[in-house]
Amino acid sequence: MRRLWLVALIASLGAVANPAAAAGAKFDGSTPLLCVPIEITECDEGGKCYLGTAEEVNLPQFIRIDLKEKLLRGVGEAADRTTPIDFLERENGRMVLHGGQKGRGWTAVISEETGKLSATISEEGTAFIIFGACTAL
């Protein structure tokens, strides 16, 4: 029984480490993506930067990206937090998304092959650099 549990744990960790394999296909936009911000750096206009968690910088822990609806939405308790996708481009195996609202602008790049996420959010005096992972739902 213990060995079965260990095998299940290793398989789960492998799925998290390689979201494209867990999804079984490249991301084609036909289904929404679930993304997790893993590493977040917050920088101020003075050049000081701090590593933080999603909770510490007031970001949802899970973000649903729906390309058909052109919408980013928090998951769970953050489900009421949304932002429209104003621009979407696919090139060289990457999806590039842009948007903005309430005085903030954001950009995200998602690898269609691996699901790796790189994103920025900027507002007056502050910027966030986010690295994470996405998987197709």
Question: Model segments located where?
Answer:
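Bacterial N-terminal signal peptides
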Residues: V7-V16
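Short, exposed beta-strand-loop hairpins at the edges of beta-sheets
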Residues: A108-I110, L117-I129
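Hydrophobic/aromatic beta-strand elements that line small-molecule binding cavities or substrate pockets
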Residues: Q61-I63, G105-I110, G132-T135
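Edge beta-strand at a domain terminus
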Residues: T53-E55, E123-L137
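Sec/Tat signal peptide C-region and signal peptidase I cleavage site
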Residues: N18-A22
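Positively charged n-region of N-terminal signal peptides that target proteins for export
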Residues: M1-L4
